[in-house]
Amino acid sequence: MTRRLPTATAARPPSAGSHFKTLKHESLASTYITPIDREDIHALAIELDDIADLTNQAARACEMMGVERPSHAMMGLLDVLVATTAELVGAVAKLRSRDYPGIFAAKARIRTLEKQGDRVHRDAVSRLFLTGEIDVKVLLRERIVLDDIETAVDHCEIVADTLSNLAVKHG
């Protein structure tokens, strides 16, 4: 069974991020006491939005360059991205419940997943260049999409570091 890239569903409208930011600002402005500093909440929200933007960028690149079916390497990286973002969702929930040891454990799992993503990316790019007869358009398209997905995975580790720093600060 061949899977298609979910470009139509992955692409979010430009107003969705703006709407999220507006809600965040309104919520922070109307809440007198927050469990963690407003600046920390703001920084975390920006970093989480960056992951959505980077993921959307990869989807737009697929659509723009006519990727109809993801390559095996793309699917491998997308699987890592899905697993990493699922870990982040759990880690953010642990911040709310003040489960700081759980945040540190999630950070370790995210780091492991990010390293796995690095290996998948490196191997895929290496195969692209070591493969004999390959169309230069295919090579560029694959490389750009793989780089975009890898950047989103890398940013998940940055968010995990931020969550870990918040756990140290408030724990």
Predicted regions and their residues:
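Cytosolic, long alpha-helical scaffolding segments
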Residues: 1-171
